[in-house]
Amino acid sequence: MRCAILYSYAKERAGPLKPGVNTVEDAVKTVVAPVYDRFHLVPVELLKYADRKVGELDRHVPSNVKKVSSQARSVVSEVRRDGVSTFAKTVYSKYEPTAEQCAVSAWRKLNQLPLFPQVANAVLPKAAYCTEKYNEVIVSSAEKGYRVSAYLPLVPTEKIAKVFSGN
């Protein structure tokens, strides 16, 4: 738009060159006009075509895919409305029991493999020791005021022991 304004301003002020500018402009219009007339609606036609194809695709998409899409939209709107931390807490409280059940089930399946129980009995005490040391370091760094410790989670060793000992 600004280029057109600048062009018309320069054309008006062309002085003795104005007839030459008009001749060149007419020659360009003669060459470009048929091409423009033929192709200026192409972007609109492409959009119409794409819209039709999306409509056709929508008819062929299975209903469960549409349902997942609408659920994703509702999740995004919930996150926008309530905030990420509220949403994360809701998801955590909803799926934590399921994750625990899956972990216990996987543990039982692994214990059925040959040699796994012996390897687990050898590794678990060291892993428990390292986990306790990690938790102690995080707690002590938080007490000393290191900000990074606020972002590092504690490993819930008591909860893990309770979940796996109950089975």
Curated annotation (Swiss-Prot):
Induction: Regulated by heavy metal stress, wounding, and virus infection. InterPro entries: REF. Pfam families: REF (PF05755). It comes from the Eukaryota. Belongs to the REF/SRPP family. Plays a role in plant defense. This is Stress-related protein. It comes from Phaseolus vulgaris (Kidney bean).
